[in-house]
Amino acid sequence: SWDGFIAGFNQEFLIFFCIGVFAQLVDGTLGMGYGATSTSFLLAYGIPPAISSTGVHVAEMFTTGASAISHHRFGNINKKLVRHLLIPGVLGSIAGAYLLSDVIDGDAIKPFIAVYMIGLAVIIIRKAMQKNIIKKKTKRLNILASFGGFMDAVGGGGWGPIVTSTLLGRGRNPRYTIGSVNAAEFAVAFASGVTFMLFGGIQGWQVIIGLILG
């Protein structure tokens, strides 16, 4: 009912809004970490993994779309790199979203997601401290993108920390790497968000709206 909808904008909604704001600050500073940051706080608050990941990816449909447009406008996108990442990343994210929403027991994998989030935190911190790196040829981009998309959907985040950090670690140009990975992330987030809604329904609208507004 309308009264129930209005009642949903309570203190809990404010918490989700603040999580969205903080996650966006982290992502804006490092060029990655929105999903990992927001999912970590949502899980700590007691939100189930499937609802957390659904909320994050639906919110990312908006945030990554805006980011992709911005990077395109400033000429930060390597179209060849985007092509290599796009389809494998989308397929991996669809597979991960389907498993989490319709196959895997969310409570059973909570400990594994917690460990995964700690790993992502280490990756993000390392990326922030990286100095000049000798460029090396990056092989098997399709496998990297598939793995990044899959783990992003199951864990609620990780596309940036996994894909961007790996590419930067091989000495790729930061400007084009971050721009291209962020552009591909829009399709990855859109695919997983739609998959979550198809197989799990629209759950936790407070989480979704709070993160989007944040």
What are these regions (language model features)?
Residues 24, 53-61, 178-186, 211:
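Transmembrane helix-bundle signature of multi-pass membrane transporters/permeases
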Residues 44, 54-70:
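Early transmembrane hairpin of solute transport permeases
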Residues 61-64, 114, 118-121, 186-190:
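Small-residue-rich packing faces within the transmembrane alpha-helices of Major Facilitator Superfamily
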Residues 65-68, 190-197:
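A short secondary-structure junction motif
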